[in-house]
UniProtKB/Swiss-Prot annotation:
One of its GO terms (molecular function) is thiazole synthase activity. PANTHER family: THIAZOLE SYNTHASE. Pathway: Cofactor biosynthesis; thiamine diphosphate biosynthesis. Keywords: Cytoplasm, Schiff base, Thiamine biosynthesis, Transferase. The active site is at residue 96. This is Thiazole synthase. Its EC number is 2.8.1.10. It catalyses: [ThiS sulfur-carrier protein]-C-terminal-Gly-aminoethanethioate + 2-iminoacetate + 1-deoxy-D-xylulose 5-phosphate = [ThiS sulfur-carrier protein]-C-terminal Gly-Gly + 2-[(2R,5Z)-2-carboxy-4-methylthiazol-5(2H)-ylidene]ethyl phosphate + 2 H2O + H(+). Pfam families: ThiG (PF05690). Homotetramer. Forms heterodimers with either ThiH or ThiS. InterPro entries: Aldolase_TIM, Thiazole_synthase_ThiG, ThiG.
């Protein structure tokens, strides 16, 4: 049986979505209803801690798993503080660690991410760290208690696709926790490719939120992720350098 279990929770849909950049955040409810998406990320700064004013949580169905991220954190200490605030605000104990001090490419700081992961895992958080693809860092995150690792496919928000494919492939082969491809995926075909490689899930935000029709794009991504997973489970045939006939080339008309 093909199961994805993270933090004791079994997930049936392997597409995770972000909640940022939508022109109308109310479409998130429709996306969840039509695709069955179960995990939605949210930046804590978009959650009303006082209960007053606009609150992104009003647009996310209660049956979803909230995955607060530590967007804005530049150090492990800041990420830890944001995660604790999110849990205190009622966002649950799942957290996506983002520690970014690079303002140009927004690449994650793996060293600070490892530090934050260790502390928060000890405190009972289900930690999903966003990371720059690197096998040694992924192994350190595992040892620190990460429930999954989330390597980037390309820099955040670029829609450039799976540029880190070969390193992500190594992580999938060598990591004992789920590998969730996060950031940079721009088209459903790219999500399908990640899943065909054996990724456990894909997290997509910009490609859906900035599409001409976000709801239709979300449906396309959900189907692509499911198809890619099925293809992986089906064990695709090997690639060969030369052509191989699918029917005999001799004997039909005699020798």
């Amino acid at each position: 049986m093909d199961r994805l279990v993270i933090g004791g929770r079994e997930l049936k849909n392997r597409l995770f979505i972000g909640s940022g950049k939508f022109a109308d955040e109310r479409v998130i409810r429709d996306i969840v209803a039509q695709t069955g998406v179960e995990v939605v990320t949210v930046a804590l700064r978009r959650v009303s801690l006082s209960g007053d004013g606009e609150n992104i949580l009003h647009c996310i169905p209660k049956e979803c798993v909230l995955l607060p991220n530590t967007s804005g954190a530049r150090t492990a200490e800041e990420a830890i503080r944001i995660a604790r605030l999110a849990r205190a605000a009622g966002c649950g104990n799942w957290v996506k660690i983002e520690v970014i001090s690079d303002n140009k490419y927004l690449l994650p700081d793996n060293n600070e991410t490892i530090k934050a992961t260790g502390v928060l895992a000890e405190e009972g958080f289900v930690v999903l760290p966003y990371m720059h693809p690197d096998l040694y860092a992924a192994k350190e995150l595992e040892r620190a208690g990460a429930a999954a690792v989330m390597p980037l496919g390309a820099p955040i928000g670029t829609n450039r696709g799976l540029k880190t494919k070969e390193i992500v492939r190594i992580l999938i082969e060598e990591c004992s926790v789920p590998v969730i491809v996060d950031a940079g995926i721009g088209k459903p075909s790219e999500a399908a490719e990640a899943m065909e490689m054996g990724a456990a899930a894909c997290l997509v935000n910009t490609a859906i939120a900035t599409a001409g029709d976000p709801l239709v794009m979300a449906r396309a991504f959900s189907q692509a992720v499911a198809a890619g997973r099925l293809a992986y489970l089906a064990q695709p045939g090997e690639r060969t350098e030369y052509a191989r006939a699918s029917s005999p080339l001799t004997g039909f008309l005699g020798s």
